Regions:
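Hydrophobic transmembrane alpha-helices
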Residues: 19-81
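Membrane-interfacial segments
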Residues: 51, 55, 93, 97, ...
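Alpha-helical transmembrane segments and their lipid-water interface positions
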Residues: 82, 86, 93-97, 116-124, ...
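Non-cytosolic membrane-interface motifs at loop->transmembrane helix junctions
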Residues: 57-64, 102-111, 181-186
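Alpha-helical transmembrane segments and their cytosolic interface
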Residues: 4, 13, 20-38, 130, ...
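Short helix-perturbing small/polar motifs within transmembrane alpha-helices
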Residues: 26-27, 31-46, 100-162, 166
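Residue-level signature of the transmembrane alpha-helical core
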Residues: 38-42, 65, 80, 84, ...
């Protein structure tokens, strides 16, 4: 009986410290995740400053690259949160250009163009399982395909958000005109290059440093 009691008494602190260690590890992982999201959001904000404007309007920047990378590295939620933070940084630093419309329309436009447009780009993470499987099988072709499709999803969903915002904007000034068609064409002129650049850069990063997309790297 004494032997059993000693064994039990010895196992209690062991279990306690193991549980404590596990809790600390989980907290550390959450902290690391939050730090990564903050870094990628800041990088996205900076990359949005780098690019070139199109003659008819709109800018071609590299803002989608960090969102796509964090979505592949950490998943959809991390990508969506990163997109939200990028939009928030643009708004609080005054890097948004609302249309001269009613307050309600401006709020909706800002919400769509500077929050939803970047948040939905985080859905590029839908291709993360396919990428991880290809990585485990050392199939570089399928890895590249997953990256490109992820970039396409991010770009297309952002494009749709800007199209919707454009319909609201142009609809206020062009009554009777085909504002849907105009918004579709206008936003495609800069979003197509945005997709091509994002897909190319992400694919290059994957070739040069595939472990960049591994959360334990």
């Amino acid at each position: 009986m004494d032997t059993d009691n000693r064994a039990m008494s010895g196992s209690v602190p062991t279990a306690f410290f193991c549980g404590q260690k596990k809790g600390i590890t989980m907290r550390n992982q959450r902290v690391v995740l939050l730090v990564e999201i903050a870094i990628f959001a800041a990088l996205g904000y900076i990359l949005d400053l780098i690019g070139f404007g199109m003659p008819q309007g709109g800018s071609v920047t590299f803002v989608l690259v960090p969102i796509i990378l964090i979505a592949f590295r950490r998943g959809i939620v991390a990508g969506v949160v990163t997109g939200f933070l990028i939009g928030l940084l643009q708004v609080v630093t005054g890097r948004f250009y609302p249309a001269p419309l009613s307050f309600e329309i401006v709020v909706i436009q800002v919400g769509i163009d500077y929050f939803i447009a970047f948040m939905v780009a985080g859905l590029a993470g839908l291709l993360r399982p396919a990428y991880m499987k290809a990585f485990e099988n050392h199939n570089k072709k399928k890895m590249a395909i997953a990256i490109v499709i992820g970039a396409l999803i991010a770009s297309f969903l952002r494009y749709l958000a800007h199209v919707l915002s454009g319909i609201l904007f142009f609809g206020e000034f062009a009554e009777g005109e085909n504002v849907i068609l105009y918004s579709l064409i206008y936003n495609s002129t800069y979003m197509i290059p945005v997709f091509l650049f994002a897909a190319f850069i992400c694919a290059i990063l994957f070739v040069k440093a595939p472990r960049l997309l591994m959360p334990n790297s």
